[in-house]
Amino acid sequence: MNRQSWLLNLSLLKTHPAFRAVFLARFISIVSLGLLGVAVPVQIQMMTHSTWQVGLSVTLTGGAMFIGLMVGGVLADRYERKKVILLARGTCGIGFIGLCVNSLLPEPSLLAIYLLGLWDGFFASLGVTALLAATPALVGRENLMQAGAITMLTVRLGSVISPMLGGILLASGGVAWNYGLAAAGTFITLLPLLTLPRLPVPPQPRENPFIALLAAFRFLLASPLIGGIALLGGLVTMASAVRVLYPALAMSWQMSAAQIGLLYAAIPLGAAIGALTSGQLAHSVRPGLIMLVSTVGSFLAVGLFAIMPVWTAGVICLALFGWLSAISSLLQYTLLQTQTPENMLGRMNGLWTAQNVTGDAIGAALLGGLGAMMTPVASASVSGFGLVIIGLLLLLVLGELRRFRQTPPVSDAG
């Protein structure tokens, strides 16, 4: 990357055809999954008029995703990764077709929606793990920060476009259009992915999958560096669960419906700015220290968010959280990929992604519990400032991560 620029260099898309193929596939996949994410809750709500049933579908899919990440990590370290990616994407698309067919029936089956949600959650996360494990081989470890930032932008852009497109489709054609286009998009992603080179895994002894997964847990616990990265990632994800308090906080600020949308947009916007301005981040000599400081800063932004006297100041705090958490996440991703042995990349990426799923759920549950005992303002502030205290303690305790130094990479991407 350009040492003179703070802006993200997109030249990796030009110089690395394999990464460009992954970029296209990922963007199409995010939009497709976004269409699905809009359609499933709406269809279940229309069929059952029960928010509990909607929540159950989210819980089941989340559980399937967690299992898929664990299984995918083992498979990605055992089998040729391109085959795992293609198999997972194709199988996931079959589930989308099933949802489309079910929605066209005179009486769609609720059980089928739940079962296909399990199917799609499992296979979607299976492919994600293999793709993450393959990224260092596709771009080179010296370009991982740049690849991570481009990927973050892809996710944010797709996450903005897909709900809007999904809402338009629901209004004009019903859920069948969402499911059908999600299936079509998933199969289209196979075209660029077929152009990827073979992605063999390093030779390693065959062992029971549970033993292989246990070995990854042991490595995580035995490595202060990798373990510290995973712990920080989980805490940042927990902090992002503050969004469950937006509706209640919006009432205290007397926000309109249109203004509430700004609360939800603030963190993604801040994260996008963080990715766009990450041009020199890969050249930092002490990434561990920057990660720790940016993480503590993001917690402080959450603590200040709810006690702001006006909602505009709260939005600024959320955007600041998005920016700082993006810096922390990019450094987590890069250090995890560069400091993990090649033969464990699949399992470690699976565990790291799984902590994002579980961290968000735990954070939402804790905020819900706090909300039962105190006001929404107090709940958000207590959680944010509590995480600040934990973050400061980790700044002292995680000495190896704090002192970690690296030689700035020399990228050939531009």
UniProtKB/Swiss-Prot annotation:
Gene Ontology MF: a single term: enterobactin transmembrane transporter activity
Main location: membrane
GO cellular component: plasma membrane
Cytoplasmic side: 1-21, 77-83, 131-156, 200-218, 278-287, 337-356, 400-414
Topology feature Periplasmic, residues: 43-55, 105-109, 178, 240-256, 308-313, 378
SUPFAM superfamilies hit by this protein: MFS general substrate transporter
Residues that span the membrane, as ranges: 22-42, 56-76, 84-104, 110-130, 157-177, 179-199, 219-239, 257-277, 288-307, 314-336, 357-377, 379-399
Alphabetical list of InterPro entries matching this protein: Enterobactin_exp_EntS, MFS_dom, MFS_trans_sf, TM_effector
Record-linked Gene3D superfamilies: MFS general substrate transporter like domains
PROSITE patterns: MFS (PS50850)
Location of this chain's protein in the cell: Cell inner membrane
Keywords: Cell inner membrane, Cell membrane, Membrane, Transmembrane, Transmembrane helix, Transport
UniProt membrane topology term: Multi-pass membrane protein
Family: Belongs to the major facilitator superfamily. EntS (TC 2.A.1.38) family.
HAMAP family xref list: MFS_EntS (MF_01436)
NCBIfam families: PRK10489.1
Role of this protein: Component of an export pathway for enterobactin.
UniProt protein name: Enterobactin exporter EntS
Organism: Salmonella choleraesuis (strain SC-B67)
Gene symbol of the encoding locus: entS
